[in-house]
Amino acid sequence: MYLGHVNMYVRNAEKSAEFYRAILGLHTYHTAPGRAVFLSANKEKSHEVALMSVGDDAPLQAKGQVGLNHMAWMVDSLDELKVLYQRLKDANVPFDHISDHGLSLGIYFRDPDGNGLEVSYELPREKWPRQDQVFASDVVNLGLFPGPWDDDPKYSRRSRLQEPAKATA
């Protein structure tokens, strides 16, 4: 099983689609003028996101309200995440936060309708730490995700990794 698509209500699907194309590089598969736009990062799929227009006066979802917290997109390399970081800065898209999760680094921001988005890079499986290291009580930054965000005030090194135990003779 895998996730097929996410269907999101937005004020104006065409306007929101411009954001998703410019910032995330998504491709439009189909547009139903005034009603919906279907987008995908994968040209082999019809859509991964369906944006449905509900009108310019529709209220925004309040933080902490029941509903979708955020939608996460993955990139294949830390370099791709660096490119996205710069694209967001160049477009003056404010960051909610940038978090080192130990296994991954995520950049969190919002679309024009306030929907939460994350783009992240995850370490290859063979580099994952053991679970007891990820959930350890000591916060240690191992520097696994160096990048332009290092000095960004929105960057939080929340990694809960510890150095691997050294073998004793």
Kindly give the residue locations of the regions a language model identified.
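Residue-level marker for the onset of beta-strands and adjacent loop->beta junctions
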Residues: 4, 25, 35, 69, ...
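A short, polar/proline- and glycine-enriched secondary-structure boundary/capping micro-motif
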Residues: 50, 61, 128-131
